[in-house]
């Protein structure tokens, strides 16, 4: 799917649908019996701003890490801790991606999605997405019913960074960085991730597929 006009054709196809982004979390063991929808919508647009924030609408087919680098180049803060996460923009709200002290929901404003059966565009705000720990409504009750078209992020004009995750501060210290900006935090995150996992484009791997355990507060 490279144009919105192509979406009207989907309802006529088989009910078995695989919505494919970058494919970084897909391993096929046999032929898929259904229609594969490859989301290749492109575009990054600054739609509005105020004194403290910018609102950036990003098409679902854009590569996540490329968007992070674009935000850093523009001095837009908020996603630098999510550097080098594989996949596309459209997949990011599905599981509320997160790493090193930041989750997608922290910078999420709204998204647009295509209702396959009703053949219309629907806008979801943060509450309607029902974000949880690596969870959203699109992984549960609305699974395979919508195709995410774009995500709008609310990013900060502030230079304040989040280095609460211990390893980030350790790497920054080893780099001799005393007052880090978003670029330095991104560099530290990239260094940490690269030391733990090979580039999936070079060596196929399952990445980090586990979730941290959640325990009652009284046991912490």
Regions of interest found by a model, annotated:
Residues 1-111, 115-117:
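Anion-binding (especially nucleotide phosphate/pyrophosphate-binding) glycine-rich loop
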Residues 26, 121-220:
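Phosphate/pyrophosphate- and phosphate-bearing ligand-binding catalytic cores of soluble enzymes
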């Amino acid at each position: 799917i490279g144009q919105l006009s192509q979406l009207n054709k989907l309802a006529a196809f088989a009910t078995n649908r695989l919505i494919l982004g970058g494919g970084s979390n897909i391993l096929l063991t046999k032929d898929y019996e259904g229609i594969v929808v490859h989301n290749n919508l492109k575009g990054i647009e600054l739609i509005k701003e105020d004194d403290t924030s910018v609102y950036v609408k990003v098409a679902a087919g854009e590569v996540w890490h490329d968007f992070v680098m674009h935000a850093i180049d523009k001095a837009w803060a908020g996603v630098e801790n999510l550097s080098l996460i594989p996949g596309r923009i459209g997949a990011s709200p599905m599981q509320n991606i997160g790493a090193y002290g930041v989750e997608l929901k922290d910078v999420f404003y709204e998204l647009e999605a295509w209702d396959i059966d009703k053949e219309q565009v629907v806008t979801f705000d943060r509450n309607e997405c029902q974000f949880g720990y690596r969870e959203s409504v699109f992984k549960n009750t609305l699974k395979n019913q919508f195709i995410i078209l774009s995500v709008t992020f609310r990013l900060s004009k502030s230079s304040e960074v989040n280095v609460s995750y211990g390893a980030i501060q350790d790497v920054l210290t080893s780099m001799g960085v005393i007052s880090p900006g978003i670029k330095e935090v991104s560099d530290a995150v990239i260094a940490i991730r690269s030391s733990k996992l090979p580039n999936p484009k070079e060596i196929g791997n399952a990445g980090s597929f586990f979730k941290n355990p959640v325990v009652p507060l009284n046991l912490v």
